[in-house]
Amino acid sequence: MADQQEKDQKLKKQQRSNATIAFACLSFFVCMIGAAYASVPLYRIFCQVTGYGGTTQRVEQYSDTILDKTIKVRFDANTANGLAWDFKPVQREVTVRIGETTMIKYEARNLFDQPTYGRASFNVAPGRAGAYFNKVECFCFTDTTLQPGEDMEMPVVFFVDPEIVNDPDLKDVKTITLSYTFFPIEKPKPVANVKAETPTNGS
């Protein structure tokens, strides 16, 4: 009888130990998922600031320096599943002087019989060149709405930072590719029109 009780106690201890380990593993797994979701916006901000991962830079002023050296810029266009748009660059490539401000255009057409809404993501290849690819104006800064059958021209104003010539990892780069992908989004919610209350006399 004593041996049986001892075995039962050992079994209960083993079960409690297994339950503790399982709970610890589950907690770790949940924490890792939470950390992964939290890291997405932080990673996006990091990429936008540093150009890491081919994320281009947004600027509000033009380059003061234009070099004699030129570089070829190619343009790529894609649409994700669920967005019936014909989206493409007007020009497939241009050759520009480094530091020179250039405007090119994409065009999009809604092939659906209802209004559709899209948001563009973008990147540059090679990835390291994203830190030197500066966009002054871009349709990707805002969401886009296309009515049924509507065509829209979408300008992009950019320049390649002259500092790119001082980057030893990019000294042999002759071509940069700017790529956009449009994703479907839900219809934007209307902004509530709140009327300001005017005070009445005596209030």
Swiss-Prot record:
GO terms for biological process: respiratory chain complex IV assembly. Residues 40-203 are periplasmic. Keywords: Cell inner membrane, Cell membrane, Copper, Membrane, Signal-anchor, Transmembrane, Transmembrane helix. The keyword Transmembrane applies. One of its GO terms (molecular function) is copper ion binding. InterPro entries: CtaG/Cox11_dom_sf (IPR023471), Cyt_c_oxidase_assmbl_CtaG (IPR007533). Its main location: membrane. The chain crosses the membrane at residues 17-39. GO terms for cellular component: plasma membrane. It is a single-pass type II membrane protein. It is found in: Cell inner membrane. Pfam families: CtaG_Cox11. Residues 1-16 are cytoplasmic. Belongs to the COX11/CtaG family. Exerts its effect at some terminal stage of cytochrome c oxidase synthesis, probably by being involved in the insertion of the copper B into subunit I. This is Cytochrome c oxidase assembly protein CtaG. The gene is ctaG.
